[in-house]
Design a protein with these regions (language model features):
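Acidic (Asp/Glu-rich) catalytic motifs at the cytosolic membrane interface
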Residues: 85-113, 162, 168, 209-217, ...
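Generic alpha-helical transmembrane segments of integral inner-membrane proteins
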Residues: 54, 58, 76, 80-87, ...
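Short, aromatic-rich membrane-interface segments at the entry and exit
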Residues: 70-75, 142-148, 166-168, 191-197, ...
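C-terminal membrane-associated helical module and adjoining short loops/tails
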Residues: 2-42, 160, 178-290
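Cytoplasmic-side transmembrane-helix entry/capping segments in multi-pass membrane proteins
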Residues: 166-176
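Juxtamembrane "helix exit" motif at the C-terminal ends of alpha-helical transmembrane segments
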Residues: 62-67, 134-140, 251-263
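Multi-pass membrane catalytic core of lipid/isoprenoid biosynthesis enzymes
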Residues: 98, 103-148, 194-204, 240-252
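Topogenic membrane-insertion module of multi-pass membrane proteins
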Residues: 2-102, 116-128
Length: 290
């Protein structure tokens, strides 16, 4: 049997070897893995949750007509900084919770828990998002940098241990929303009304307690194996907390609205808004109760 000899190339150089099928498939597979990891990283950053950072624009929105272009830009930069800061926290929290999330019926499909995104990549991305958030804050004011740093410290403490303490975990989550509102006020140099901050804290605590209730109902006796704080929560105490935070949120919001300077017609619309706020919270609570 005679061997087939490849003809020499015209240039005198030996013919180039074509990549094998295995090598080609390996490269394609590697490219797909990188693409999946980047897509998973974007999902783990939870951009759909950035809507929560709209609370940064709450106080700037009240004085929209007097802000000017510079004030509007500062408010939007502050909001963007909190979007990055919150994504940084999500990535850190999911990295730390990846083992527990694998036992959760829903959270096991998260990119980090499912292995699509490596813990190393998630940690690096978390740090980069946090540093970028601080840099954006510096463009507005040093005080905004301090507030963003406080938010990152508070939420990192939550991820590292405070989430294991019942009721403290809810308070920390609610405090995060208060810091968002304060950040918006600082960005535009506005006063921070205590009544509004109280309403925001109570409203955020109300929503957080609702999530704890849903988790307790969904997981039952297994809830504490996923989140140690759930071993302390009881439906009766959560329901009492829901009633209390709902009342505080609506009353303080109503008092804040009444303290604003409105024309009579405007005051009526504001009170109507407070009533609508009550109904929204009520509808959420009814849904929780089934």
């Amino acid at each position: 049997m005679t061997a087939t000899i490849a003809p020499p190339s015209l240039s005198g150089q030996p013919p180039k070897q074509r990549p094998s099928v295995i090598e080609t498939e390996g490269r394609h597979g590697e490219a797909h893995r990188h693409t999946d990891a980047l897509r998973g990283l974007l999902r783990a950053a939870r951009p759909h949750q950035w809507i929560k950072n709209a609370t940064v624009l709450m106080i700037p929105g009240l004085g929209f007509y007097t802000l000017g272009v510079a004030g509007l830009v500062d408010a939007l930069v502050a909001c963007s900084a909190f979007c990055l800061a919150s994504s940084s926290v999500y990535l850190l929290n999911d990295t730390l919770d990846r083992e527990a999330d694998r036992h959760h019926p829903v959270k096991r499909h998260r990119p980090i828990a499912s292995g699509v995104v490596s813990p190393t990549l998630a940690t690096v991305a978390s740090g980069a998002a946090a540093l970028t958030a601080l840099a954006l804050g510096f463009l507005v004011s040093p005080m905004l940098v301090a507030i963003i740093a406080a938010y990152l410290l508070l939420t990192a403490s939550y991820s590292l241990g405070l989430k294991r303490l019942a009721w403290v975990d809810v308070a920390v989550l609610a405090a995060g929303f208060v810091l968002r509102v304060v950040a918006g006020a600082v960005a535009v140099g506005a006063a921070v009304p205590l009544l509004l901050l109280t309403a925001v804290f109570a409203g955020a605590a109300f929503v957080a307690l609702g999530k704890r209730r849903s988790e307790l109902v969904l997981l039952g006796d297994d809830a504490s194996s996923h989140r140690s704080a759930m071993g302390t929560y009881r439906l009766r105490t959560i329901d009492a907390g829901l009633a209390a935070t709902q009342a505080v949120a609506v009353v303080t919001f109503g008092l804040w609205v009444l303290a604003l300077e409105f024309e009579p017609a405007g005051a009526g619309l504001a009170l109507l808004g407070a009533a609508g706020f009550w109904e929204v919270l009520n509808a959420y609570r009814r849904r929780l109760m089934g």
